[in-house]
Design a protein with these regions (language model features):
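Mid-domain alpha/beta scaffold segments of enzyme catalytic cores
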Residues: 1-271
Length: 271
């Protein structure tokens, strides 16, 4: 699995398209993705400015790029009374298909807990109002994260995906019971940090699994192909998909077909 393989069309549901790491090589990154068979992707937003920028320009770069609009918990301190209106404008475009990346992150605390809760709650309200999926982030805040979602959705399923799931079977079960889809990144390839995720992998229903790189972050361990830097790229998604297929005993072609169909079902991205 050391080299990128050209495979049946893959859909990367998590790319940080306007990361500074891609600033001088955006088109090259997109070209390599296409060469590797990654023909579709979701470019995820972290604040209002990035949401607007993605909304205005990302689909021009590549025919099958969809976007999100939202405020990451790290940027929750930037949330104000105008934020929801700005996100609402982006979401009027059919290419803007989810609210996020939003949630709670009590690990690095770039925004206070109260700021994060306020921004998260308002974005949930908007998602419920518009009937669009949530693109969810959670780190070191599981219990409160689940509590906030349950309080606002009640007994209804939560329409959305847990971005970059890294946790254990018990937490996986909670998310699945809420109706959520599960996004798996190259974290699963890490021998030490990915142990819980690998243990949980076989318990993710086939119709709830999504695959993503979270590029340029989380370059999969064990990859020894053409890239010599630490940067991750969407063209490495075939490596991640093949790793997941081997871990779960699935046929690679079927896994790719299933995860792509799951993505279309959740985000309504089928052209």
């Amino acid at each position: 699995m050391g080299n990128v393989k050209k495979v049946t069309t893959l859909f990367d549901v998590g790319v940080n398209l306007y990361s500074k790491q891609f600033k001088h090589d955006t088109q090259g990154m997109l070209d390599r993705a296409l060469e590797a068979g990654v023909e579709s992707m979701i470019a995820i937003a972290s604040d209002v400015d990035e949401s607007v920028k993605l909304h205005q320009s990302a689909p021009i770069l590549m025919p099958k790029v969809w976007t999100t609009a939202g405020i990451h918990p790290h940027q929750a301190s930037t949330f104000d009374t105008t934020s929801i209106d700005a996100l609402r404008v982006c979401l009027k475009d059919s290419r803007c298909i989810a609210i996020g990346e939003c949630g709670l992150d009590y690990n690095r605390m770039f925004s206070s807990e109260s700021e994060q809760r306020v921004a998260f709650s308002h974005q949930i309200e908007l998602a419920i109002e518009l009937g669009v999926p949530l693109y969810l982030h959670q780190r070191d805040a599981h219990d409160e994260f689940v509590s906030v979602l349950r309080a606002q959705f009640g007994h209804k399923d939560v329409l959305g995906v847990i971005h970059c799931f890294t946790e254990n079977r018990a937490r996986l079960r909670e998310y699945l019971d809420m109706g959520l889809y599960i996004g798996v990144t190259g974290w699963v390839c890490d021998e030490r940090r990915g142990r819980d995720l690998r243990d949980a992998l076989s318990y993710i229903p086939k119709d709830r699994l999504l695959v993503e790189t979270d590029a340029p972050y989380l370059k999969p361990r064990g990859y020894t192909g053409i890239f010599k830097t630490k940067r991750n790229e969407p063209c490495l998604l075939p490596f991640i998909a093949e790793f997941i297929a081997k871990q779960t005993g699935a046929e690679l072609a079927h896994l790719i077909e299933q995860t792509t169909e799951n993505t279309h079902r959740l985000f309504k991205t089928k052209l």
